[in-house]
Regions:
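Short, polar/acidic, helix-capping and beta-turn segments at strand->helix junctions
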Residues: 1-85
């Protein structure tokens, strides 16, 4: 098992890592919409989603993968009315 870390995504805020490479798959931790350069969180759900996905992209690229390699995602939203956006 290899720990994956990039400065292009927010650091883990608990006792975990951004991702681990298990050899035949990479598992990422949950990502939040924090801009790793500024520490800011956008107020709009669309921008929050974009930032969270950019964070995932940065982590998997650090592991040598692309978004085309992602086989499963789970999305959590605070307000289901925002889901369609």
């Amino acid at each position: 098992m290899t720990v994956i870390h990039t400065e292009n995504a927010p650091a883990a805020i608990g006792p975990y890592v951004q991702a681990v490479d298990l050899g035949n798959m990479v598992l990422t931790s949950g990502q939040i919409p924090v801009n790793p350069e500024t520490g800011e969180i956008p107020s709009d759900i669309v921008q929050q989603t974009r930032q969270s996905l950019n964070n995932v992209k940065a982590i998997i690229e650090q592991a040598g993968l692309t978004v085309a390699d992602i086989v499963k995602t789970t999305v959590f939203v605070k307000d289901l009315n925002d889901f369609a956006r």
